[in-house]
């Protein structure tokens, strides 16, 4: 099941972007928004506010990637953040039930597209002295214990 909705921050001055159109596309993204809004170490954040051009390995054409988040911390560090289920952060592997099925082919093309996006994001971050992070549910579960989310 996909969860989608609008987020309404309590710390309006921290959000960089359209405060009336902060959309989350999963409960993990919503959880990260709460974390950014409530965490005193994060002084600035945005959701899908950055654009990273990349070349898709699927069609060889230039496309635009909108990373899930941008954050800036108190000490000046800047991060580009992608929230992804852990299973989508690794190459798909065929199993006895998942040989060259339609689902496996879809996972393979998505993996190739994501690798191209993430490589382009890492290049942009390196150029600007930022860090690129892929955050999974494992990381977000930890925030429950650290920040009560």
Which residue ranges define each predicted feature?
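Electrostatic, structured charged patches in enzyme active sites and in nucleic-acid/phosphate-binding
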Residues: 1-149
């Amino acid at each position: 099941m996909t969860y989608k909705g609008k987020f309404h921050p309590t710390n309006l001055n921290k959000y960089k972007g359209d405060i009336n159109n902060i959309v989350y596309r999963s409960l993990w993204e919503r959880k990260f928004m709460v974390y950014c809004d409530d965490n005193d170490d994060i002084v600035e954040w945005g959701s899908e506010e950055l654009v990273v051009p990349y070349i898709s390995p699927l069609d060889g054409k230039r496309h635009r990637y909108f990373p899930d988040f941008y954050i800036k911390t108190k000490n000046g560090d800047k991060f580009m953040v992608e929230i992804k289920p852990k299973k989508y952060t690794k190459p798909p592997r065929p199993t006895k039930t998942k040989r060259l099925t339609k689902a496996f082919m879809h996972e393979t093309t998505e993996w190739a597209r994501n690798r191209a996006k993430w490589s382009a994001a890492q290049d942009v971050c390196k150029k600007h002295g930022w860090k690129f992070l892929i955050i999974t549910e494992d990381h977000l579960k930890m925030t429950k214990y650290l920040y009560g989310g």
